[in-house]
Amino acid sequence: MNKVFGTKGSHWRKLDNAAKIFPATSNKKDTRVFRFYCELKEPVDGSILQSALDKTIDKYPVFLSVMRKGFFWYYLEKSDLKPKVKEEVDPPCLNLYIRDRKTLLFQVVYYKNRINFEVFHALTDGTGAIQFLKELVKNYLILRYRDAALPDISFTEEDMTLQDQESDGFSKYYSKTEGRQGKKASSFQISGPRTGYGSLNITEGLVSCQALLKKAKEYGVLSLIHISEPTRHS
């Protein structure tokens, strides 16, 4: 069994079951990269964000790994690469995993008030990405406001080990029991001109909170469900 990253003599780790599909199916059209971000009330200081990232990586050493391909499977290999914070200039969610190249599988970029964290899905899932981003933002705020003596809050269980961080939740919780098969509604088909090959757009909008809550109440759902449901069925 391979040793855990961050421990003496550890150099590689296998992908968990849920991650195995991503290296083989990623391409320029579907990069298998996703993004979480945090928007602050003031412009981001890039140098402070770099220091915060350096501190965050110490807690999550597995994020310094690169993807390698063996004879029969892909695996993550420990690397000495160091992540560099950049100001955002490219479209979101471009390729992070490039075959036969030794590159990190995540990046931290900033734009005005926003801290963006992008990651290749084989490296972590949404839960792990949120934990990383929360730790990053916490470290940034502590460094940015040293005089405020902000508390160093822990977002993970106090007794969580590196083995816990790298555990395969798919193997632990997956069940072969088939659920009830109901009739599925047809998905909504988005019309209009398509985005160029291999690129994404970010669409932002403002809406009245009162109007949103009123409309959600008419449907008997939470406001978040009212916003996300059309996207989920598209």
Enumerate the language-model features and the residues they cover:
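Single conserved hydrophobic/aromatic residue that forms the stacking wall/gate
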Residues: 226-234
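Alpha-helical scaffolds flanking conserved acidic
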Residues: 115, 221-225
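Flexible, P/S/T/G-rich "lid" or insertion loops adjacent to the active sites of thioester-utilizing
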Residues: 169-221
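Non-catalytic N-terminal regions of enzymes
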Residues: 1-165, 213-215, 232
